[in-house]
Design a protein with these regions (language model features):
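Short coil-to-helix leader/linker segments, especially the first N-terminal amphipathic alpha-helix
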Residues: 1-3, 282-292, 449-464
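Short, flexible hinge/linker loops that cap or flank conserved catalytic cores
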Residues: 13-14, 305, 474-475
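A short, compositionally biased domain-edge/stem linker segment
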Residues: 2-11, 290-302, 465-470
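Conserved S-adenosyl-L-methionine
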Residues: 23-25, 315, 485
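Long, contiguous domain-sized segments
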Residues: 35-167, 172, 356, 362, ...
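S-adenosyl-L-methionine
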Residues: 1-54
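Conserved beta-strand elements of the Class I
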Residues: 18-20, 310-314, 480-482
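Extended, highly charged clamp/arch subdomains and adjacent linkers
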Residues: 150-441, 694-706
Length: 706
């Protein structure tokens, strides 16, 4: 029997009534000071905390006061008049949360550890380990809550990652402001936040290693291959709790008692649920029904074949690239890679056999040698490709083509000119109605290249309008499902990608992309998609929007207005989802060695919020792929539902999300994000790099981004 626990511990206050220090606001702050004040304090208003004003007449002349939960950050910022007031921190639980935050920050900074806020406001404690020429920090997040998953107080604890820090100060290294963070005493600051007193006392602080600073600091970012990050996270959380929290010093500093000796809080059995077993089933071309594409796609073939296509190569004109192209041709067509060189009695090279690409696709391959392009240099590649594609005599009208781009450039290269080449080639090909598949040349030499081929075959199948695998039974009524994903890249405008009208087989109908702030363009696309859906399927039973963020009230009103303008009235549900890798609350299966709950498990967190698990464990003893859960928040976005989410709708929507997680075709490996979010995110990641910063029409109707 599974036993699920949260990464959270139960605590109780020794005394609910406390004396706390509050401050009146202070005017005349410049923009930077005002920003710091907002970061380091919480605002308490008379309207929201009437009992505080009633019990403390000294506040009667004020409408608001502030609690400084991040005190060091306010070093050189003036404060208003101070008031020591009595408060029931169970009754005023919001103030109680931040009073506990204040004391946690004080405690760990008192131990000399750097402490900062993470991007969603949690406390992040950095625990150091000396590595000789650098300091490695394990980062832990803490967040107090009241009456969340318990009837009292809790502290959620998570391991959020590792960071490496130089032992040289800003005085000793010449770094610009580009993405640089520094550890200054017990603060973690951006370079531009470092002030004069930081230089005087700490030499400006110690730079943190990132992809921009690692060369200048001659240090690498912390990278280690961990086969089970889920178990590692669980173990590190337990060690941190027992080492730093379940101590008299910590409990006295917060004036709390940690219950059950710091044991993790168990999930209530009534909050552990499972999708229907049929929702897990996938079907393939020969009729086989399974659940693990990594083991099944190669043997049973695509559920629906890709449309016939012809392919050609695009690669650098060099002896090495030409040899690589010939090897890849032989692997695709003949299932062989032979590069044996004999010198006397000594043989060197490779002699490997593979399953031919056409066997994966269950159709013959058609290579067109005269279409292949060998460009002279990276500097001329785009111009040569454009001229190559302008020769219409090379291409047969009505024929599907795939360009196999053999790239010597790693996708994560830090050379901007080379990095952009990858995206621009895809854009040029799409403008000529040609999709593409990029293969990183060094992978061909990898001893595991045989395991790359199923991924390539699955992606090509999807790009050519086939289905590598499908759902045996899609949990869907006549629903219109829209996915909206986002991409925000450093130095570029954020973009939204959208995927519209997934049908009952899980197929998409159309993609689009726009700048994140262009809500008018997004609304126009949504109207067009709704009109098209009604034309093909009549009125939708429900409009379900898978959204990368929580829906604002005004956005919900815009959606409802759009429905009225189209003459439609139907329930609208918005599902916000985030991958819970470093989230505040995750459930672990304490009865398993890898702590991973079974695939299809979903855990009720609070209100309409759930954790959903998709992996490859389907029994108590099966092996689980290490995929973190996604956190779902389901909300009603219109008045047709009266704001009520029924049990039936909840089960339907969660099951839909689970099944869309299982239709990711960029790889045969299972994924934890539904394609309704993952595919639009890919689109939004690519488009900002395109020359026109727009998605070509051809790219709106196929899975070119796989």
């Amino acid at each position: 029997m599974s036993k699920l626990v949260f990464n959270s511990i139960a605590v109780e206050r020794r005394n609910n009534y406390k004396v706390i220090d509050l401050f009146a606001g202070c005017g005349g702050l410049d923009k930077a000071m005002a920003s710091t004040w907002k970061y380091a304090t919480i605002r308490v208003t008379k309207e929201s905390s009437e009992s505080l004003w009633k019990d403390n007449p000294c506040l009667s002349e004020l409408s608001e006061v502030f609690l400084a939960d991040w005190e060091v950050e306010l070093y050189d910022i003036p404060r208003g008049e101070q008031f020591s007031v009595k408060a029931d921190l169970n009754d005023l639980c919001r103030i109680g949360r931040f009073e506990m935050t204040q004391k946690i920050v004080r405690y760990f900074r008192g131990l000399g550890f750097p402490v900062c806020r993470d991007f969603i406001g949690r406390i992040e404690v950095w625990i150091p380990k000396d590595e000789g020429n650098a300091i490695l920090y394990n980062r832990y997040t803490l967040r107090p809550y009241y009456k969340d998953i318990t009837d009292g107080w809790q502290i959620d604890v998570s391991h959020s990652g590792e960071s490496r820090c130089s032992k040289k100060t800003l005085y000793e290294v010449d770094l610009d402001d580009h993405g640089v963070e520094v550890i200054v005493g017990t603060e973690v600051l951006r370079r531009k936040q470092v002030k004069q007193h930081h230089f005087q006392k700490y030499g400006g602080g110690y730079p943190i290693v990132n992809k921009y600073t690692k060369k200048m600091l001659n240090l690498s970012e912390p990278r280690s291959y961990d086969r089970n990050k889920y178990a590692t996270k669980m173990k590190k959380v337990n060690v941190f709790i027992q080492t730093y929290l379940v101590t008299p010093q910590f409990q006295d500093a917060l004036d709390i008692n940690i219950l059950n000796n710091g044991a993790l809080i168990e999930v209530k059995p009534s909050d552990i649920l499972m999708v229907d077993d049929k929702a897990k089933n996938l079907k393939y071309g020969d009729g086989y029904v399974g659940a693990i594409p990594r083991n099944e796609f190669s043997e049973h073939g695509p559920f629906t074949q890709p449309q016939p296509f012809k392919y050609f190569f695009v690669s650098l004109d060099s002896p090495q690239s030409n040899a690589t192209r010939n090897r890849l041709y032989n692997i695709f067509q003949n299932g062989r890679d032979t590069s044996i060189i004999r010198q006397g009695d000594i043989e060197t090279g490779t002699n490997r056999t593979f399953k031919r690409l056409g066997e994966y696709l269950t159709q013959p391959l058609s290579w067109v040698p005269k279409l292949s392009l060998s460009y002279k240099s990276y500097d001329t590649a785009l111009q040569e490709l454009q001229q190559h594609l302008m020769d219409d005599s090379r291409f047969i009208p009505g024929t599907n083509y795939i360009a196999i781009i053999i790239s010597e450039i790693h996708k994560d290269t830090q050379e901007p000119r080379l990095h952009e080449l990858y995206y621009r080639m895809k854009e040029l090909l799409m403008k000529s109605k040609i999709t593409s598949q990029v293969i990183y040349a060094p992978n061909i030499d990898n001893n595991s290249f045989a395991y790359f081929l199923p991924n390539i075959a699955a992606a090509i199948t999807g790009k050519q309008f086939g289905m590598p695998w499908g759902l045996e039974s899609l949990s869907q009524r006549n629903d219109m499902i829209v996915g909206i994903g986002a991409s925000k890249q450093q130095g570029r405008k954020p973009y939204l990608g959208t995927a519209f009208c997934f049908d009952k087989e899980g197929q998409f109908r159309e993609f689009d992309c726009c700048q994140a702030e262009d809500t008018e363009a997004l609304g126009t696309s949504l109207k067009k998609a709704l009109w098209q859906f009604c034309k093909e399927y009549q009125k939708p039973d429900r409009l379900i929007i898978h959204y990368y963020k929580k829906l604002r009230r005004e956005e919900g009103e815009q959606i409802e207005m759009m429905l009225k303008q189209n003459g439609q009235q139907c329930p609208v549900y918005v599902v916000n989802m985030v991958t819970a890798v470093n989230d505040d609350l995750i459930a672990f299966d304490a009865s398993k060695s890898d702590f991973m709950p079974a695939s299809g498990t979903y855990v009720h967190l609070r209100d309409t919020q759930f954790l959903l698990y998709n992996n490859e464990r389907y029994s108590d003893y099966g092996k689980a792929d290490i995929l973190f859960p996604i956190k779902l928040t389901i909300t009603s976005a219109n008045t047709n539902t009266g704001g009520i989410l029924t049990k039936e709708d909840t089960i339907d929507i969660i099951t839909q999300v689970y099944q869309f997680c299982r239709l990711y075709w960029k790889s045969v490996k299972m994924q934890n994000v539904p394609i309704t979010i993952a595919y639009p995110e890919l689109v939004a990641e690519y488009v900002p790099h395109f020359n026109d910063e727009d998605l070509p029409e051809f790219g709106k109707h196929n899975l070119w981004m796989l």
